[in-house]
């Protein structure tokens, strides 16, 4: 189910303030956020946002193709290490 158009996209207010400050300054740094559910809006383009994955902040460089998506879509929360490898030598017949 999608969000109602009259409500608009969800963006954390303090994140917008931080992005505006970075856009007004020449100095660019990583903006840390724990809000993975924020929608990416056009003023965020070109900024690097550190999105929390449950363990650490992963830097995400926002581009124009990301507009309308959520920040959490670009950071994995689970590590897939592959299936266990089986040794044919250690297998015993019964």
UniProtKB/Swiss-Prot annotation:
Pfam families: Ribosomal_S19. GO terms for biological process: ribosomal small subunit assembly; translation. It comes from the Eukaryota. The keyword Nucleus does not apply. It is found in: Plastid, Chloroplast. One of its GO terms (molecular function) is rRNA binding. Its main location: plastid. InterPro entries: Ribosomal_uS19 (IPR002222), Ribosomal_uS19_bac-type (IPR005732), Ribosomal_uS19_CS (IPR020934), Ribosomal_uS19_SF (IPR023575). The keyword Nuclease does not apply. GO terms for cellular component: chloroplast; mitochondrial small ribosomal subunit. Keywords: Chloroplast, Plastid, Ribonucleoprotein, Ribosomal protein, RNA-binding, rRNA-binding. PROSITE patterns: RIBOSOMAL_S19. Gene3D superfamilies: 30s Ribosomal Protein S19, Chain A. Belongs to the universal ribosomal protein uS19 family. Protein S19 forms a complex with S13 that binds strongly to the 16S ribosomal RNA. This is Small ribosomal subunit protein uS19c. It comes from Euglena gracilis. The lineage of its organism: Eukaryota, Discoba, Euglenozoa, Euglenida, Spirocuta. The gene is rps19.
